[in-house]
Amino acid sequence: MTEAPTELPPEDGTPPREPGDEWVIEILRDIKEEALKHFDPRLLTALGGHIYARHGDTLERARELIRVLQRALFTHFRAGCNHSRIGQTRGGNPLSAIPTPRRM
């Protein structure tokens, strides 16, 4: 068997990133974008500052922000956010427009 090629460090001399780093950063951008639609930006800035004070500018900080924002958004949607169907009784099933097979 041949060994997997080793990753070369970037040309600017910084240490190489792990493969999942880009994914974590991309997910954080998406969640922050969604959180800004539902929460006060000052609150999100304060949250980011608090997590930065605990974890510094690390990948662990990004993961912690993702965890906290996911929980906050889930709770917000369950409480009946007007931008979401989760927790709301009005509005029909979005899948009801799809016809079911006759023999079901």
From Swiss-Prot:
InterPro entries assigned to the protein according to its UniProt record, in alphabetical order: RetroV_VpR/X (IPR000012)
Keyword Electron transport: no
Role of this protein: Stimulates gene expression driven by the HIV-2 LTR. Prevents infected cells from undergoing mitosis and proliferating, by inducing arrest or delay in the G2 phase of the cell cycle. Cell cycle arrest creates a favorable environment for maximizing viral expression and production.
Name listed for the protein in its UniProt record: Protein Vpr
Phosphoserine modified-residue sites: S84
Single GO cellular component term: virion component
Organism: Human immunodeficiency virus type 2 subtype A (isolate CAM2)
Compartment annotation: Virion; Host nucleus
Transmembrane residue ranges: none
Keyword Cell cycle listed: yes
Region (Disordered) residue spans: 1-20, 83-104
GO term, biological process aspect, one: viral penetration into host nucleus
Assembly notes: Interacts with human UNG.
UniProt entry keywords in alphabetical sequence: Activator, AIDS, Cell cycle, Host G2/M cell cycle arrest by virus, Host nucleus, Host-virus interaction, Modulation of host cell cycle by virus, Phosphoprotein, Transcription, Transcription regulation, Viral penetration into host nucleus, Virion, Virus entry into host cell
Family matches, as Pfam families: VPR
